[in-house]
Amino acid sequence: MATKLDYEDAVFYFVDDDKICSRDSIIDLIDEYITWRNHVIVFNKDITSCGRLYKELMKFDDVAIRYYGIDKINEIVEAMSEGDHYINFTKVHDQESLFATIGICAKITEHWGYKKISESRFQSLGNITDLMTDDNINILILFLEKKLN
């Protein structure tokens, strides 16, 4: 079990990247990004101190707001903060819902950071492999390649 000190010294491999990683590491990228969103709040880091890749992923917060609406996001974030730590990824069916789901997961772990909950692994929200199907990986890679090139 990792300690808070271990979490504070966590290494984020993609945080400074300005381009998309390989297809094989896209699941690791999303997992790490969601964890990083909590980490920067828990340890009072500068959220803007990152590469273009993470900055592009942060825009998914806006997609989540448009997709779910701010009231629904606040409701989900509060429910997730009170013990219901699972998101049903089967509702992801297109690009917008994929990006909105990534955005809301980031907002949830960020909110946990404000509550001093050091949630160091994204798996507590659900199984990332459920979200990152081959089709969703392709959607995400193509979108990010287009944005970052």
From Swiss-Prot:
Induction: Expressed in the early phase of the viral replicative cycle.
Principal localisation: host cell
Pfam families (alphabetical): Poxv_Bcl-2-like (PF06227)
One of the record's GO molecular function terms: protein sequestering activity
Cross-referenced InterPro entries: Orthopox_K7, Poxvirus_Bcl-2-like, Poxvirus_sf
Subcellular location, record wording: Host cytoplasm
Gene Ontology terms describing biological process: symbiont-mediated suppression of host cytoplasmic pattern recognition receptor signaling pathway via inhibition of IRF3 activity; symbiont-mediated suppression of host NF-kappaB cascade; symbiont-mediated suppression of host TRAF-mediated signal transduction
GO cellular component, one term: host cell cytoplasm
Keyword list, A-Z: Host cytoplasm, Host-virus interaction, Inhibition of host innate immune response by virus, Inhibition of host NF-kappa-B by virus, Inhibition of host RLR pathway by virus, Viral immunoevasion
Top-rank taxon: Viruses
Family label: Belongs to the orthopoxvirus OPG044 family.
Quaternary data: Interacts with DDX3; this interaction inhibits DDX3 and suppresses DDX3-mediated IFN-beta promoter induction. Interacts with TRAF6 and IRAK2; these interactions suppress TLR-dependent NF-KappaB activation.
Described purpose of this protein according to its UniProt entry: Virulence factor that affects the acute immune response to infection. Bcl-2-like protein which, through its interaction with the DEAD box RNA helicase DDX3X/DDX3, prevents TBK1/IKKepsilon-mediated IRF3 activation. Contributes to virulence by binding to the host TRAF6 and IRAK2 and preventing host NF-kappa-B activation.
Protein name (record): Protein K7
Organism: Vaccinia virus (strain Western Reserve)
